[in-house]
Amino acid sequence: MSITTERIAAAARKLCEAPGPSGRECAAYAAAKELLSPMGEVKRTPLGSLLCCVNEGKEGAPHLLLEAHLDQIGFIVTRVEEGFLRFSKVGGIDARWLPATPVVIHAAAGDYPGIITSVPPHLAGDGSDHSIKIENLLIDTGFTAETAAKLFAPGDIVTFAAKPVELQNKRLAGPALDDRIGCAAVIAAAEEIAAEKPDCKVTVLLSSMEEVGGQGAETGGYCGRCELWGWLWLRAGENQSPGRRHHAGLRPHPEPGLYPEAEKAGRGK
């Protein structure tokens, strides 16, 4: 079984369809567990990260941890106000592109569609500050004030309603690709490792809460007790030309000798 674009894209779509803002990764955790369970026992850390040993390795061999973060950016309801929902962001979100964005409210009684709205520009008054601030935005669900008060409550999570779509040239677009595409790549690599059974021990960590501080990765890494840590993350920019098989970047403190070896592997040498 070889790693292919199609396999990674299929896993990414499955993961992206599961809601999982930081701290509420349960549905995304369940989707990832389903994909990883055939390779080993899946455990959940106290902060909600997923750990799965996919290869026990030989005694005394190094322990490699492959990690990507499972959570996504999203929102949380802070107040139900005359049928509308006030909300706060979970993770780094620019409020300027939020108006008219379709969302899903995950309430106790089920999932409900909504749309982010704001005061129209021509009704905003003559003040000089027309910048969009998240505290001035609302989610419109279409319900009456009485019904909304029964259905929704502070603490309900909200995610983007968009679904992953395949673009031309095998490109995938959609919510939560940061970092579900990294999770899909880690899972694909785990399948290869489980089949080939190398000497080293290999554990997969799909971490929680990266978008709000990275607590899941920090604590999950201690649970894994590894010597080497490989981290896959979505990167935006123009320094990755189409058709290249890999993208590698240097951090301030890389393991000596690891970067050249990773680069060789990426080039197929």
Protein language model annotation of sequence segments:
Residues 1-269:
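N-terminal hydrophobic/helix-forming segments and targeting peptides
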